């Protein structure tokens, strides 16, 4: 795990990895990334099954799930847990290109798609979308609230 993460969202990054397999080439292709994700998710995965550095950045969810930290990582693992599956998930960011700048090879405000953009995308394409806030509310309705002490730990 990254010992001194300066991430303002407190995302628990680990070391980047690729699958240590004869089927892995550079690690960057969709095939290689999918193989790495399957390797990471395998119940019997061992450190020697992975090589470092790589192109996949594993994240660790907090033990208290979305009740402890309302992040994408915890939400993905929470959905797995609620479905009765192993607490292993793959997440990806949706991105926006921004608007073209006339006469220039650049765009304004490209970056990660935010909440409202994701909700609009889901509506446009008929996809089910759930906000982290709604997931927290659902979990707290079904289970007890997680009590956090004054220093931010459970």
Region annotations inferred by a language model:
Residues 1-154:
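Catalytic domains of riboflavin
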């Amino acid at each position: 795990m990254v010992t001194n993460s300066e991430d303002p969202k407190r995302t628990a990054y680990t070391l980047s990895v690729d699958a240590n397999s004869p089927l892995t080439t550079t690690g960057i292709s969709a095939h290689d990334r999918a193989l790495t994700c399957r390797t990471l998710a395998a119940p019997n995965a061992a450190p020697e099954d992975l090589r470092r550095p790589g192109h996949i950045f594993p994240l660790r969810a907090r033990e208290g799930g979305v009740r402890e930290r309302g992040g994408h990582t915890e939400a993905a693992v929470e959905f797995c847990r609620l479905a009765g599956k192993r607490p292993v998930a793959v997440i990806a960011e949706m991105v926006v290109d921004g608007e073209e700048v006339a006469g220039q090879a650049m765009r304004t405000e490209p970056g990660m798609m935010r909440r409202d953009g994701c909700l609009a995308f889901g509506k446009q394409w008929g996809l089910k979308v759930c906000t982290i806030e709604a997931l927290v509310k659902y979990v707290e309705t079904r289970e007890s609230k997680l009590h956090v002490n004054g220093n931010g730990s459970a």
